[in-house]
């Protein structure tokens, strides 16, 4: 059951098999998404932020098909991870909020990464999980750039 024409064609559908970027996939080879992969997004600070100090407060949202078990953040390209504080969702369909404070070791450029893990042990991948025409299901580790002063 769906609510009209916006649910046709490629809407909420992914290729039934792996395809190369840019490939035209026939509508009959598309399948409806039935699950939501675990995902987190950093919502603050904005990418490109220039800081005066080395202490960074991070906030964001996370979701999954089921419950999210944890969110971790990294400032060293995933070499080390720090657990973020994860708030309980307001209901079973709501995004969860997370926050963390990290100390950057010195002035310079940093990529801050967030990575969520669900209760089944599925974790966001560091690389793109696979191309599809609308980008559905892209749950790659989220990154922002900051410049610490």
Regions found by a protein language model. Give the residues of each.
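Extended, aromatic/histidine-rich regions of cofactor-dependent oxidoreductases associated
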Residues: 1-149
